């Protein structure tokens, strides 16, 4: 093989390597680029993974951890909503929901998180969401097989209002800030 042929082979291998690496990088989903059909972007909750714990809950099919951004945590600590005041603008809640499974390691019966099911979010922004008490709602479903998120099929910023209207007196928030 002469020098020119080796150069062509090397260039071809390099181009193929760049294509493969680029394809892998592109296939990794950036969840923060997602938006609900109503326009609420996942990026509104960027950093939710590091928010403080508000509470936990369990339904028959989900284990849930409710997290809050610094704005809502400060509001809870000041007595909201128990003092009759509404949560301030910019308050945000993230509910991380897993499918449960029985622990095979614990010496007692306990449900532990299995696969992530979905993420549910609330955001206080009275200008953007005046028709729902100032709160916007979003849910993104997680597909463990592809490790990707998709906007929930209900997909509108008002999808959570139907349930949360039951706690209007607590500014539409179900979970109290639990004692630590």
Feature locations, PLM:
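Intrinsic-disorder/low-complexity peptide segments enriched for small residues
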Residues: 5, 14, 32-34
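Positively charged n-region of N-terminal signal peptides that target proteins for export
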Residues: 1-8
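Bacterial N-terminal signal peptides
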Residues: 10-21
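Polar low-complexity intrinsically disordered regions enriched in Ser/Thr and small residues
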Residues: 6, 41-42, 71
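Sequence context surrounding c-type heme c attachment/ligation sites in exported
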Residues: 28, 32-60, 84-180
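N-terminal post-signal-peptidase region of extra-cytosolic proteins
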Residues: 65-83, 104-107
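Short hydrophobic transmembrane-like helices used for membrane targeting/insertion
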Residues: 8-9, 26
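Sec/Tat signal peptide C-region and signal peptidase I cleavage site
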Residues: 21-28
């Amino acid at each position: 093989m002469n020098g020119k042929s080796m150069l062509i082979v090397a260039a071809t291998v390099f181009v193929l390597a760049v294509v493969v690496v680029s394809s892998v990088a592109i296939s990794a989903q950036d969840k923060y680029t997602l938006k609900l059909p109503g326009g609420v972007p996942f990026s509104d909750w960027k950093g939710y993974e590091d928010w403080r714990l508000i509470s936990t809950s369990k339904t028959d099919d989900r284990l849930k951890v409710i997290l809050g951004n610094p704005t809502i945590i400060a509001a809870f600590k000041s007595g909201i909503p128990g003092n009759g005041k509404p949560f301030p603008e910019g308050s945000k809640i993230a509910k991380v929901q897993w499918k449960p499974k029985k622990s095979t390691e614990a010496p007692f019966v306990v449900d532990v998180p299995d696969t992530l099911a979905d993420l549910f979010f609330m955001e206080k922004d009275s200008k953007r969401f005046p028709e729902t008490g100032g709160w916007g709602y979003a849910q993104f479903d997680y597909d463990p097989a592809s490790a990707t998120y998709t906007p929930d099929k209900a997909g509108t910023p008002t999808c959570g209002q139907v349930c949360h209207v039951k706690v209007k007196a607590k500014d539409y928030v179900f979970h109290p800030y639990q004692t630590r």
